Amino acid sequence: MTMFSLRAAAAQIPGASVTGDDSVRFERVSTDSRSAGPGDLFIAIKGDRFDAHDFLPQVAERNVAAVLVARTPENWSVPAIRVADTREALGALARGWRRQFDLPLVAVTGSNGKTTVKEMIASIFAAAVGADARLATAGNFNNDIGLPLTLFRLHAAHRLAVVELGMNHPGETEQLAKLAGPTVAVVNNAQREHQEFMATVEAVALEHASVIHALSPEGTAVFPADDAYASIWRVAATGNRIIDFALNNAERTTEAAVQGTFDDKRLSIDTPQGHLDVTLQVLGNHNAHNALAATSAALAAGVSLDAIQRGLESFGAVKGRLQVKQAALGSLAGATVIDDTYNANPDSMRAAIDVLASRESPRVLVMGDMGEVGDNGPAFHREIGAYAKERGIDALYAMGDASRDACTAYGAGAHHVADVGALVAQLQQAGFGAAATLLVKGSRFMQMERVVDAVTSPQPNAAGSTPAAH
């Protein structure tokens, strides 16, 4: 699909100028010098460890249509858009491209569960219009490079779209939301994330409100009615349609447009359009909450209840997010392994422990350090150790310096280990057997998937001897 001419592309970017033939048109946008090719506009991004301008001679040899750069080598002949900052230009161009398309676009943010909610919505949209007619963020391409590249994938055949907005510093959500131009803004929750950079949970909630502020007057805001910070999002949505949601139980009922009750994997949903009974394939109350968020967003985008049900029931766990696997190593063979290794913060750790607590004994928590917790690190880790003990978890195995505090708070039955090899060896020696359930979780830098890989392989592997990353 032909995108912009260089003249039209430069018009989307403040301060841009064109050298060479400005009538040249491009078909795709690339930021990877290794895969750029004919028909591409190559955008040279400067990163922390590289500068793609250094690879422009190789890019020229790949016969790209044009480049977008801050500078060019001497004797450069490939048509070019010149800008002061290529990263900002990438976003401006993506914003211009997104505005070529009039379709429902859902933007998802929140402290925990946003990738799962995004994937649930993508599954619902695929059920509604087919996978080829819906655009969805691939993986977690949710930052100021990943989101523009996602938006550049929009084409005329798309009828629905869902994108994920990531954040770890103040102001990022506002920037990304302006690029996305959402018609539906989803805030899944506000919890203790990125506390090294976001001083309070209220600051997190206000940051997430930026996606609602990016709505046009015709847009719809989606958020949990029972969240402590719902009032912030309700004020942000003044003048917009609101579809709020709540997961209720015998102890607590919250009035909301979309309400659900959950028992094991059976989710009963009441909506303004009617009732749904959905059998989820994923674990935990928090995934029932995620399903209500996805349902609300889909309703806002005009999707039928039938497609919502089909999409939710066909949805499986996202990699590294409460994936159920089976141990195969030694005495652990046959044990259930819950792989929740993608990332961790105090609230997602507590939610995962709740899932573990619902299983039969022996229940084993295998945890790594939680990152980006700032000065609250010791207190947060002690909280998790104490919570695991309170919820009846039978044993705690921890790796990483900060997790020593979790072991101290847990008390008897806690084991702190130096590396993955020692951890796996101790798990085998403990003799938990096939009836056990192991929950493995930690922040991304801990690479706790190495533990999962080790225990789900019938033979010891190289991951078992790799020291923990710090």
List the model feature ranges, each with a label.
Residues 1-18, 36-41, 47, 51-54, ...:
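ATP-dependent carboxylate-amine ligase
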Residues 2-109, 116-127, 145, 152, ...:
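Short, basic phosphate-binding NTP loop
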Residues 118-122, 258-276, 323:
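Acidic-glycine-rich active-site phosphate/pyrophosphate-binding loop
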Residues 77-86, 239-246, 256-259, 410-418:
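Active-site regions of enzymes building and remodeling cell-envelope glycoconjugates
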Residues 76, 89-225, 229-238, 433-434, ...:
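Phosphate-binding loop of NTP-binding sites
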Residues 67-74, 225-228, 247-250, 400-404, ...:
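Short, polar loop motifs at secondary-structure junctions
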Residues 9, 40, 59, 93, ...:
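Residue-level signal for inorganic ion chemistry
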Residues 56, 60-61, 177-178, 389:
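Non-catalytic positions within long, well-ordered alpha-helices that form the structural scaffold/packing
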